[in-house]
Amino acid sequence: MKVTVIGCYGGFPAANEATSGYLFQSGDYSLLVDCGSAVLSKLFGYVPAEKLDAVVLSHYHHDHIADIGPLQFAKQVGSFLGKGEHTLPIYGHDADIEQFQKLTYKTHTKGIAYQPDQPLTAGPFTITFLKTIHPVTCYAMRITDGSHTVVYTADSSYQDSFIPFSKDADLLISECNFYADQDGTSAGHMNSLEAGRIAKEAGAGELLLTHLPHFGVHDNLRKEAKTVFNGEVNIAKSGFVWEG
């Protein structure tokens, strides 16, 4: 399994960066997890629209879905140019039916509702879900290709259920919108110590901090998480690659 960070900022993209987007690849299958602002401009450096096999969305905040519309247009233009005719499945929850319905665009993309209490199969990947604590309905994901497992917290304040959900994951991709001396609970986000605690208590192999803030020194997030978790800790950035 190969995971490439496409975008990692919370809220809005920093200059020459993107918000949430993660490319999961196994064999010749490419799965995009979340599709935030400026993600496409980065994604197309790795895989063109016609080679993308599926998209799965954690929730419908702009910084996780802003480039869905442009992706739909990319598929449409590609079909005009004869670059593949397959309909791109976009998986999302249907708790917000208005947003879910926007995932289907003509014959180019089709919104498919995942059932949070059931595993989702997308090519070689099996995805299970955990509801998070966030102002809108949002789901964390545990993604495995049968050999390796990656857990993505999506957006959430801390909850104990992340620990069994993340148990023995090879990589934990945890949101980290706040520093150790800050409390992100009311905003539905976590700080560095909380991310480190989940990684430690779940027995994760590595920790990748993402959904980064637009203030402070990001390496301090890593240092703070390291005071709790003894494993490898990295700060996400566009182009970061993890291979299991």
Curated annotation (Swiss-Prot):
Residues holding Zn(2+) 1: 59, 61, 134, 155
Alphabetical UniProt keywords: Hydrolase, Metal-binding, Zinc
Cofactor annotation remark: Binds 2 Zn(2+) ions per subunit.
Highest taxon listed in the record's lineage: Bacteria
Cited Pfam families: Lactamase_B (PF00753)
Entry GO MF terms: 3'-tRNA processing endoribonuclease activity; metal ion binding
Enzyme class at the top of the EC tree: hydrolase
Cofactor: Zn(2+)
Listed EC numbers: 3.-.-.-
Binding, Zn(2+) 2: 63-64, 155, 211
Family, per entry: Belongs to the metallo-beta-lactamase superfamily.
Protein name: Probable metallo-hydrolase YhfI
Protein species of origin: Bacillus subtilis (strain 168)
Lineage start: Bacteria, Bacillati, Bacillota, Bacilli, Bacillales
Annotated gene: yhfI
